[in-house]
């Protein structure tokens, strides 16, 4: 199993249990789904719920949302306007370029070329994006973006993360 973590905060952002696609060698697209589940409910494969005794007087709470967000404890954040988002992107890209120059100098030019196209595209879709930090809620780290796409007539949540802001860990 692979888990992608924020290089600056160490927060888990997503894993390979989802469909992951790399776009322009700079952006991961992670395809999730909307789920509802009971809090504290552990479901075991092969268990027969009808054979279990019903517990009386217990109330169960449910949570619903995008599975990637819930499973990796991402926290929604926001930008007041496109200008604030642009400022974040510029500052974050400077941090990534500095890190790339230290760790992978050969990737800097490809990154700079491809990221400009991706950033322009993101800014054009600003109103359609939701924003999430990792569990630590450190806004100095990666802020993932979430959008909904129509795929085969279904609204599918897609989490967008900058490749160079992540490190891959194998378990």
Curated annotation (Swiss-Prot):
<dbReference type="InterPro" id="IPR034737">
    <property type="entry name" value="TCTP"/>
</dbReference>
<dbReference type="InterPro" id="IPR011323">
    <property type="entry name" value="Mss4/transl-control_tumour"/>
</dbReference>
<dbReference type="InterPro" id="IPR018103">
    <property type="entry name" value="Translation_control_tumour_CS"/>
</dbReference>
<dbReference type="Pfam" id="PF00838">
    <property type="entry name" value="TCTP"/>
</dbReference>
<dbReference type="GO" id="GO:0005509">
    <property type="term" value="F:calcium ion binding"/>
</dbReference>
<dbReference type="GO" id="GO:0005737">
    <property type="term" value="C:cytoplasm"/>
</dbReference>
<dbReference type="InterPro" id="IPR018105">
    <property type="entry name" value="Translational_control_tumour_p"/>
</dbReference>
<protein>
    <recommendedName>
        <fullName>Translationally-controlled tumor protein homolog</fullName>
    </recommendedName>
</protein>
<comment type="function">
    <text>Involved in calcium binding and microtubule stabilization.</text>
</comment>
<feature type="domain" description="TCTP">
    <location>
        <begin position="1"/>
        <end position="171"/>
    </location>
</feature>
<dbReference type="InterPro" id="IPR011057">
    <property type="entry name" value="Mss4-like_sf"/>
</dbReference>
<keyword id="KW-0963">Cytoplasm</keyword>
<keyword id="KW-0106">Calcium</keyword>
<comment type="similarity">
    <text>Belongs to the TCTP family.</text>
</comment>
